[in-house]
Structure formats: structure tokens, C-alpha cells
């Protein structure tokens, strides 16, 4: 399933690599890899496979959540599809509380006393996912884990989740992407080394 989703993300252009002209991330960082999992919304087969992969991860981890929480904004749709398949309640978490109305950071029914799985589309440093999980904890939730579609596999993110004492897992990521591209002959050993050097620099 993971290998299939890696291939599908490449096929629809959700993950792209360009070693000649680097992409510019929101942070301003120049990168040879760009991930936009929002594209998966437009591909029913891909998004269904992603939801099924999340269910498989839950089964493998032995987790039984009461609630599925989506991280705003790209994690919301995947949390909705997953919660629908599981027949579970869903909430979503903003990066910060609203500046109007009730000033909610978490939208949906109360999560107090509930066991919650957090869904994120992408983990880079892990910062935004951890902040969402902490907001849920402050609201009285017990966090099972953060699940994402793709991870860059940075040491920085591993350390951050460890320090926050929050489990995390991802369907696919940087290492699986390289394996897929090497296997299909689309990436040379030299290009692979350039990508690995880039990741180590972060």
C-alpha cells in the first residue's frame, strides 16, 4: 500500500523533484523537493487509498481512536474521509484560535476525555503537528499519535516528537520516494546523494 501511494503521489505531481531549478518553500528555503498533498483531493482513487492506508496503520499499531482530528488546512479533508470510513466523530484544529466569534482553535464537539488521532498531510519539522496535538491535549484529549501522508524524515522532527512525547507515523516519505525513483531508473546515484545531502543540511 505504501509503495502504491508513493507512486501515485509522483504520478499526480503531489511530490516533485527538480535538481536543476529548486523550489521555494513558504519559509523561503530553496529545496529540490516539493510536496503538495492538497492535489490528492482531486483524485478519488488516491484519496481513498490514503484513507485505507491510515486504517491499516491504525490496525498495525493497535489503536482505537474515539475522534479523528485534522490539522488545518490540508489535513482536514483527509481526516474527514478517514472518520467517515471509520464512522467516527471528527474535529479540526487551527494553527491559532479564531480572532472572532468564540475564538475557537478546535472546531467540532468537545474532545475532553476522548482518545484522538491527529491527521496531518505533511511532516517537515513537526512543529505545526505538535502544536495541534498540544491544543487538543489542553482541551482534555488523549493523543494516540499524529499520522501523516508524507514525511521528510528529518532528525529535527524525530527529536521534536520525542521531546513532546507524542507518537507519529507516516504512510510514505523521503526515503520511500528515493527508493521508488531509484527502482524506476528515474534517479541516478549522484542525484540520490544530492537529495540526501540536502536533507542532512536541514
Curated annotation (Swiss-Prot):
PROSITE patterns, A to Z: PUR_PYR_PR_TRANSFER (PS00103)
The protein's Enzyme Commission number: 2.4.2.10
Keyword Glycosyltransferase attached: yes
GO biological process: 'de novo' UMP biosynthetic process; pyrimidine nucleobase biosynthetic process
Binding positions (orotate): 124
Binding site for 5-phospho-alpha-D-ribose 1-diphosphate: 94, 98, 100, 120-128
Cofactors that this protein relies on: Mg(2+)
Keyword Magnesium: yes
Keywords: Glycosyltransferase, Magnesium, Pyrimidine biosynthesis, Transferase
CDD domains xref list: PRTases_typeI
Known catalytic reactions: orotidine 5'-phosphate + diphosphate = orotate + 5-phospho-alpha-D-ribose 1-diphosphate
Pfam family, one: Pribosyltran
GO molecular function: magnesium ion binding; orotate phosphoribosyltransferase activity
SUPFAM superfamilies, alphabetized: PRTase-like
Pathway involvement of the protein, from the record: Pyrimidine metabolism; UMP biosynthesis via de novo pathway; UMP from orotate: step 1/2
Bilayer-spanning residue ranges: none
Function of the protein: Catalyzes the transfer of a ribosyl phosphate group from 5-phosphoribose 1-diphosphate to orotate, leading to the formation of orotidine monophosphate (OMP).
Subunit structure: Homodimer.
Stated family: Belongs to the purine/pyrimidine phosphoribosyltransferase family. PyrE subfamily.
HAMAP family in UniProt: PyrE (MF_01208)
Protein name as annotated: Orotate phosphoribosyltransferase
Organism: Oceanobacillus iheyensis (strain DSM 14371 / CIP 107618 / JCM 11309 / KCTC 3954 / HTE831)
Amino acid at each position: 500500500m505504501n509503495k502504491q501511494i508513493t507512486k501515485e503521489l509522483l504520478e499526480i505531481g503531489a511530490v516533485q523533484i527538480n535538481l536543476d531549478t529548486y523550489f521555494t518553500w513558504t519559509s523561503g528555503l530553496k529545496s529540490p523537493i516539493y510536496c503538495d498533498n492538497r492535489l490528492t483531493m482531486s483524485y478519488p482513487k488516491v484519496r481513498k487509498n490514503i484513507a485505507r492506508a491510515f486504517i491499516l496503520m491504525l490496525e498495525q499499531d493497535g489503536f482505537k481512536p474515539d475522534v479523528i482530528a485534522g490539522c488545518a488546512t490540508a489535513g482536514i479533508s483527509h481526516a474527514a474521509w478517514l472518520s467517515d470510513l471509520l464512522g467516527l466523530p471528527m474535529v479540526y484544529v487551527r494553527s491559532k484560535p479564531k480572532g472572532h466569534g468564540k475564538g475557537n482553535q478546535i472546531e467540532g464537539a468537545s474532545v475532553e476525555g476522548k482518545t484522538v488521532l491527529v491527521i496531518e498531510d505533511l511532516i517537515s519539522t513537526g512543529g505545526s503537528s505538535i502544536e495541534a496535538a498540544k491544543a487538543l491535549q489542553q482541551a482534555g484529549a488523549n493523543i494516540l499519535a499524529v499520522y501523516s501522508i508524507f514525511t521528510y524524515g528529518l532528525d529535527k522532527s524525530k527529536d521534536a516528537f520525542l521531546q513532546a512525547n507524542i507518537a507519529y507515523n507516516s504512510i510514505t516519505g523521503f526515503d520511500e520516494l528515493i527508493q521508488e525513483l531509484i527502482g524506476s531508473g528515474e534517479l541516478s546515484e549522484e542525484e540520490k546523494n544530492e537529495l540526501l545531502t540536502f536533507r542532512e543540511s536541514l
